[in-house]
Amino acid sequence: MIICEIGLNHLGDEEYALEYVSKILSTDVDAITFQIRESDFYVDTYDSFILSDNFYRNIVEKIKNSNVLIGIALSDIKKIPFFDSLNIDFFKILNNV
């Protein structure tokens, strides 16, 4: 299984993130994982790295329509219900220490 994990390479730019995912989907990847970091990780620059909930709704649909698994890597388990409502295939819990 090949999993492509998308960390901060999008720098909060949703158009770039969409383009990035589209290029990944043109390969033989089996799954894509997005890392979700919390505000205390970024200190003052956090807001510039956030992708919107609407972006995640749309990108999950795009990935699932491509028959690729979608995962979310996060340390704030309070965010799981939102992503679970999008029918995420798997979760990866990050260490928040």
Over which residues does each language-model region extend?
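Catalytic domains of carbohydrate-active enzymes, especially glycoside hydrolases
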Residues: 19-37, 86-87
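Generic structural signal for well-ordered alpha-helices
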Residues: 21-25, 53-60, 80
